[in-house]
Structures are given as structure tokens and as C-alpha cells.
Amino acid sequence: MFKIAQSDIQQEIKDTKFLAVISDDTTDVSNHLQNVVILRYLVSGQVVERFWSFCSMKQGDAVSIANVIDACLSRVLPNAEDKSKLIAQCYDGASVMSGLEGGVQSIVKQSYPHAHYVHCYAHQLNLVLQQAVSQVSQIRLFFANLSGFSVFFTRSPKRVAFLDKSVGRRLPRSVKTRWNFQSRLVLTVYEHQDDLIECFQDIIVNWNGDQTTVREASGLLKCLQDRDFLGYLDFFHKIMPHVEILYAQLQRRQLDPVFLQNCKSNFIQAVNNVRSTIPHIFPPITPASTSAKRPRVDTSDEEKSRILHEVSDIIISHFCSRFEFSNHLASATLFNSESFEKYNQAFPSQILKSTAESYPMLDESKLRSELAVIYSRCEFRQCCGAVALLHLLQESNLTETFSEVIKLLMILITTPMSSSEAERCFSTLKRVKTFLRNTMSDDRLNALAMLSIEKKFIRESSNFNQRVIEMFAHLKERRATFLYK
């Protein structure tokens, strides 16, 4: 069934003009790391996101991940001329996936030159902090300890009763496929430090049960009394709200490059403001007494301050690289129907120029002429968005007349945008992560994931069951014979 479904996807991609790949590293309930590959393209004017497969990762470096993605792409784009179809790539997870120099996106672009790296709405922006976690060992340890708070209280209703008595609210559950919960966890632990200390002390003294609970409560209590942990908690408590604000701003319906640039500037300024407070997070330790002896110099706080400066740099650097390419946002404004009348008076030549530079498969002069006609006619001003305009042109049998406009519309709709796309499709990546609440062997996982996530696609596939039976019957290494003359 899995192979038949993949062959149908291959045929759909063969018939489509453009393709985007979305990849992410995710875990099942057994914490087994999987790399998932999702393919996004248009079918009969409707955008679809098809689950392709899970791939086990023995190594998490950029070259290994790029090889896995390239192996998947080579199956759906086998010919050299097909490589121009890939116009977007979206990655989440480990830092090696998104570096400007030698990251996965750079390696993939060597083989697929038109595959621009863009931020996808399905990827939580809190992965900026995940980048810090994956690169700096001390911060990775901090988040590991932090997640222990929510894990501790999700194991037992009896523990939750102690928490409710002391804190009056439950901690956000730490779910690895939902990084936005980490921000809530940081804020909750920071705001209720004293209450949590009281709770753990209460458990240590009054717990009547397993010793594991007492041991874990003692460990978490030590975290809340540890100067390093509290310093990092203070830092991320200041950073997290700005990440949440930025994520909310990116959900704006009409997201243009000017607005994005303002958001970038404000976010970078906010991070730099937090960066300036780092010396106050770990203030220098003054000698306990003055003496004729030379005082000892404690460099540990200097090292921790250096780490937080490094984390600040990582956050800013990753954010800038993630939104380095934003021409697709500018191109989308060409089809903002509210601006058609204005464009009819003053044509957006600069936006058209950047669009043609980003997508060389477009004929700039022909596209300009077609857009000028659209801007001048009233019937097109009723279209709300690129999808509606594409459907109108197709239903009106104008695909040949507006061939370059159709091509650009397909590119923009195929490209995952930064904001939510409810009118296009529900994120397949989110459905994959929901499915991964289960765990099983790789082959069975791929097959059952395909049947679960793409059940509608399989139901609509012609003669699917018959083709599965025929493939099964023609398998050579079987104990029983199913074909008779």
C-alpha cells in the first residue's frame, strides 16, 4: 500500500509544475528520532501537502540530512530538467539544517538552484531557542532540567495535588513536538519559584509513597536553588516574550517585506536590550574580605556571561538567516486585490523586478503586460488572494492568455508562507507529529503513517486496492503462490 501510494504521488508531481519540500526532525513517544519529508504542490488548482516518508537518522549532521532529503527528491524528480521544479525548502530542528554556510539548505540548493529557503508557518518560531539548545551544552542542560518540572507533575495525580496546594495552577505540559509550550514553562517556573520551592519541600517531608518521587523532588529543588539555573531562567524569561510577540506578528494575513523588516529590526533590538542586562544576571562576586593577599579571580561568572552573549548571537543570526529570503512575500503583494486600483495608476515595477530575479523561469516582459491587464479590469478586483485569482483564471479558460500570471500564482501558492494558511491546506507536518504519539518499526511506521495521514488521497486514488493486490501477488519471495495460469 505504501509503495502504491508513493507511486501515485510521483505521478502527481510529474504532472505539476512546481514543488516545495518541508522537512523536520521529530520524535515518537519512545524518543526515537525520525526525519519526516513532506512534499507540497498543486493538484487541479488546489495545494496539497503529501506525506512522503520517515527516515531514520544515524547521524544528525548537515551532510547526512541533506543526503536523506536528496534521496527522497531524486525519486520524485528523477530527471535533470525536473530539478527546476523545486522552488522552496523549509526546515526545522537542528541548527545544521538552516545555516547560511554549509547548512542543509545550502547543500540542497547546489542541486536545486531555484529552491529558496523560507520560513514555514508549520514551524514554531520557538525553534530559535532550540538552536541555542542544540549548540550550547550548558543551555541544552538548562532546558533538559527545565522540562523535568513538567514531566515530574504529569506522572501522578498525587504530585499534582501537592502542586495545586502550593502553586494553585498546573505547569504547562512539555511536549517535544510543541516547542511553544517551553515559553509558557519558562514563564511559569520563573513566576512561581518560591511556590515551587515550597511544593518540593512539602513533598520531601510529607510524601508517603515511592522514593523516586522524593529523589526527583530533591533534584528539582536543587535546580531552583542553583545560581546557574536561575541565571539562565532569568535570561530566557526576558527573551521568550519577544519570541512570542514576533510569532504573533508573523500570523498577520498580509505579510509584506516592509512589515517583516520592521519586525526583524524590533526583535533584534529587543534581544540586544536583553543582552545588555547580562552583566546584571551574573554580577561579579566581590571578595568576602579585603586582605594583603591577592584576591582570587572567579571566572565562572565571566564564562556564563560569555555563554549568554553567544546565545544572543545565535538567536539573532538564526533569525536573520531564516528570513534572509523574503521576495516571495513581495511577490504575493502583486496579487493583493485591494491594491489593484493603485497598481493600475502606478505599476509596481520594483516588485516585479525582484520577482523576476528570484524566479528566472518567468518571462518578465510578458508578466508585466498580463499584470497590467489584470490591474485594469474590475472583475479581477473581487478576487481575495492568489488562490481565488488562480481559480477564476482557470474557470474562465484564461490559462493561455495569462500564462505567466498563472505560473507566478502557482509558485506563490506552492511556496509555504510564514503565516497561517487556513484557506490552502491544514499542515501535514502537524498531522504527522500527532500521528507520532505512537511508536513502531520503520517500515510499518511509514506504511501506517501513509494510510492514516493520506487516507483521503488513497480513497480517491483509482483502483488502489486492485493495484495493491496485484503488487502483493507478484512479489517473488513468498511461501504461497497467488498467480495461476
Regions inferred by a protein language model and the residue ranges of each:
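Alpha-helical structural modules in large enzymes and assemblies
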Residues: 1-485
